[in-house]
Amino acid sequence: MFLGLFQYTIDTAVEHTVEHANLSQEEALMLEENIVPLRQATHVTGFLLTSVFVYFFALFKASSYKRNLLLFLARLLALLIYAPILIFCGAYLDAFIVVATLTSRLLFLTYYSWRYKTYKFLIYNSSTLMFLHGHANYYNGRPYVMLEGGSHYVTLGTDIVPFVSRSNLYLAIRGSAESDIQLLRTVELLDGNYLYIFSSCQVVGVTNSGFEEIQLDEYATISE
């Protein structure tokens, strides 16, 4: 019977064997003594696998908002439904690992959600996010960010963020790191798409490479 995520106990199997084989008390004790090393090895392995899996489950981040929302709901179900089932079945160690790990992670992210008045830290399972006109996505910690888009919109993750003017366009970094990254350069491509370059460092030059005698202004325009 699986009591934990991976922890397998053979106690039930031993009890059924003793019952069906009509073993005496001495024979049953001898059987249990023989399987003690196997039981200990199984419990240690189950503990390690459970710990690794729960840690991965608590920190995993999906690529889209909807998938992150499903993962957030799965974590709540693990706390509210799965952990009590583990306790009821007697898997106290597994239940403790699940509750302690997930609760610690949720409380850590709840602090940033409360501080910045947004639930997206919990949904995205990240302590640092970049915001653009109310939309959020992961921030990799680099001093520059390049986003794709069009003449009046920017693609932030899977969201399309429209804007009227580029003059007030910037990325708000919030969470464990806090800063504003201004829009420094806009690159217009031949196919009509745009590249928006946000950076906390000033741009000192733009180098055109790989066009083989074709001038940059024939294919793209760069504006501040």
From Swiss-Prot:
InterPro entries found in the cross-reference section: a/bCoV_VIROPORIN_3A-like_CD, a/bCoV_VIROPORIN_3A-like_TM, Coronavirus_Orf3a/b
Keyword Membrane recorded: yes
Transmembrane among keywords: yes
Cell compartments where the protein resides: Host membrane
Transmembrane domains' residue ranges: 40-60, 69-88, 95-111
Primary localization class, coarse: host cell
Organism: Bat coronavirus 512/2005 (BtCoV)
Domain CoV 3a-like viroporin TM, chain residue ranges per copy: 34-124
Cellular component aspect of the GO annotation: host cell membrane; membrane
Membrane topology per record: Multi-pass membrane protein
Pfam families: Corona_NS3b (PF03053)
UniProt entry keywords in alphabetical sequence: Host membrane, Membrane, Transmembrane, Transmembrane helix
Annotated protein name in UniProt: Non-structural protein 3
Ranges of residues in domain CoV 3a-like viroporin CD: 128-203
Additional comment: Bat coronavirus 512/2005 is highly similar to porcine epidemic diarrhea virus (PEDV).
Domain of life from the UniProt record: Viruses
